[in-house]
Structure formats: structure tokens, C-alpha cells
Amino acid sequence: MKPTVRRNRAVTMSCVLALLCSVSAAALAAGPEIVAGPAADPTCYVPWASQTKFFKYPAKPGPYRIALANGFIANTWRIQMIKTSKAYAEQPGVKAKLKEFKVVSTGEDVAAQIAAINNFIDSGYDAIIVNAQNPKAFAPVIKRAKAAGVILVAFDNILDTEEAINVDVDQKGLGVLWANWLIKHLPSGGKVLEVRGVAGTSVDTDRHNGIHETLDASGKKWDVVEVVGKWDDPTAQKATADAIAVQKHFDGITAQGGDTGVVQALIDAKHPFVPFGGETENGFRKFCGAHSKDGLVCSSAGTGPAQVAVAMKTAIDALEGHVVPQSVKLPLAIVEDPNFKDGENYYSSQSDNFFVGNAFPTCGINFTAQEIMGQSEANQ
């Protein structure tokens, strides 16, 4: 074939690809088509409710540029989540579909997180995964993403909109679960320490509301003392120690994270062990397994940081034109006394700073500790 002919064909093919990308971007900007369910992967993508809509975006050619816009980073869960996202991006079946995976954490500054998302939109990313610092502050950037044909998938701290995809567990239901555990083990009510998460986030608000609505509805008398632990062991430990110093005694505890630190504060203060509804940190479960007979009667429930991988999978499937729910409901990982078993649902040989149950088998998502801990939490 003559060089001129080859060049002409190459130019023609480039033009065709450019046209396809242009048409795809324009179609994405129009938003998804609302279609009948089920989802393309119904065992993974469980709709939040019977009235949840199903989205079908126009298929876009890969490989894709996907970004993770995280906010707060200074706790074990967020660090493990960032590492998990990178581990998932390196799995062969996922890596082949990614041209680029970018991670940015902006701290508690909502404006900085929104600016990061705007930058990803301006840079032409195909999808952006978001752990929102404040769910109600994102309306303008959600509209910008839609206009640019960028798919937004929020997880954990989700977005207050039906124009993006949300992936989460029932955070309020988690608060209800913990409160019911205290109601069961404190038949006369009592004084409860509530260790909250990061202020302003939907997770903290939903869990808090679930706890209080359930305790209030029990008909028992409760005195709830609230402190802020930011889902972080050192912060939660200090907040608990300060609360014990002032209040002297608690009949029960519920904590959203940093639970290993909370129990350590009890031990340091020589406070009796009490019923505890908490998260899924390995260190917390170690304590629950070791001190059940001493009164540390635990309900350990939550969702592992691997939900970021479900959000990434959702974004890729949406870009490929597969049907997904607008709101995906993930299962909780629950272990309650007396069912704590070393080597099964906690691991004495592993670090305390590790969230157990970091898998979603129904989505084909699982990780070894080595896969996750071999990654860095730094921006990339």
C-alpha cells in the first residue's frame, strides 16, 4: 500500500474515533436514560428501594480516566479506603479498562474538594468517584459534571441528589442497630457515651439520627453524652478519656469509629467494661473477643473501605453502557457477641488499624491484606 493511502486511512480512522467520542460526550451530557431494571449485575447492584430509578448511560469507548476526590484523610478507614482504591485499580481486569486513575484528598475543606472535582471535570476525566465532605454543598458541581458528560459516583458520604449515582450502606440503619444493642443490654436505660464522626458528613448525621430516634422510641430513660472522635483512634481515645474524667461513669457506649482508641481509654481509666455498639476495626474486635467475659459485650458492624471498589466498578459499568441503579445499597458486615472468633472475623496477627470484612463477594470484590497495605494513601 502506498504511504499516501495509509496516511489517508489513518486520518480517516482518527476522524471516525474523534466523531464517536464527540457523539458519546454529547450523549453523556444529556444525562442517562431512565430504564426498567434490573441492573446488569443484579447480585451486586441492589437498588436502595423499590422506587429507585435505573440509569443507562450511552456507552463510551475505553480505556477510561477516572478520579477519586476524597475529603478527610486523617483516620484509619479513609487511609485503608485510599489504599483499597489503588489496589482495585491494579487488578488485571480493572487495570485494562483504565487509562488513568487519579487520587486527591483535600481534608475537611469543602470548597477545596469541590475545586478538585471542578479541576477533574475541566481536565476531561470520564468519571469521578466522590466521598463527599458535605452532601448539600455540591449542587453546582453536580450540574457542571452532567453538562460536561462526566459520570459522578458518590459513596460512603453520598450526594444529596438523584443526578449522580450513590453507593452506600444504610448508615441510619447502622445507628439503629447499635442503639438496639444498647437497649437489649441495658434494660433500665442509663448514661451512654456517643463517640461521633466527622461533623457535617452524611454518615455522621445519619448514624447519629438512627441512634437517637431508636433510643427515644424505646421508652427508657437515656442520658447521652456526645463527643467528637472523627472516626480516628487517637482523637476518639482522648475524647473518651476526657468524657470519663468529667462524667465518671457510663453504662454503655456507641462509637462510629476510632473504637480501638475508645476501649483503650476505658482500660487506661480503669472504667468497667460496658455494652458497646461499634464499627469493624480489627483492634476493636480483638478487645471484644478478649474481654467479653469481663463485660465488653459488643456489636461490631459497618461496611469496609472496599465500598470504594464497588463505586469504581459502578463507574466503569456505567461508562460501558450497562444498566445501574441510581442508588445502590450495600450489605453490612455484622458480628455480635458471643460470635467473635480469632482467624475468622478478627485477626490477632494483624494490625489493630485495619477494618475487617473489607470485601463484597456479591460484586466479585475481595482483597488480601497484603494487596491493600502494599499501597500508599498519598495523592497520585
List where the protein language model places each region.
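Coiled-coil-like amphipathic alpha-helices with heptad-repeat character
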Residues: 1-4, 73
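Bacterial N-terminal signal peptides that target proteins for export
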Residues: 3-16
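Bacterial N-terminal signal peptides
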Residues: 14-24
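A residue-level marker of the well-folded mature domains of exported/periplasmic proteins
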Residues: 28-380
